[in-house]
């Protein structure tokens, strides 16, 4: 249901998104404000991070950086997480959206994002749709 909620831009009322935001705030409060917090996620996890940053000032104030990978990002989701100009300016400094060209889950992120910086990577030319979405695109490296 969370995937559907973000697909149509109603994740604010989705219990999974609400729970994730509360859990994130609770974890940060338990460790204190003197820590350097960062958020990360892939696919739905990346969408959770974007939603948390747009919806919670207490999370936003504590987080120093965000790196997300092929987040679920649709036009309705985009419209639902828009923030005011001042907040956008703050989030543009913290949020980095990494996506593979041709990934359909993060497809709208190549057009525009509500905030943050987009880094786009090329997939192997023989990659199928699942290959383009996998986190392996960002973790497989030659040693």
Predicted segments, located by residue:
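Compositionally biased, intrinsically disordered low-complexity regions
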Residues: 9, 34, 42-43, 74, ...
């Amino acid at each position: 249901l969370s995937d559907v909620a973000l697909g149509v831009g109603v994740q604010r009322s989705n219990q999974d998104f609400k729970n994730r935001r509360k859990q994130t705030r609770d974890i940060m409060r338990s460790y204190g404000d003197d820590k350097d917090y960062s958020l990360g996620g892939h696919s739905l996890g990346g969408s959770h991070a974007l939603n948390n940053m747009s919806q919670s000032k207490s999370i936003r104030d504590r987080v120093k950086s965000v790196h997300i990978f092929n987040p679920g990002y649709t036009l309705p989701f985009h419209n639902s997480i828009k923030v005011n100009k001042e907040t956008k300016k703050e989030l543009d400094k913290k949020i980095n959206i990494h996506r593979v060209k041709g990934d359909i889950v993060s497809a709208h992120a190549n057009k525009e994002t509500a905030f943050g910086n987009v880094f786009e990577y090329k997939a192997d030319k023989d990659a199928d749709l699942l290959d383009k979405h996998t986190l392996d695109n960002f973790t497989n490296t030659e040693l």
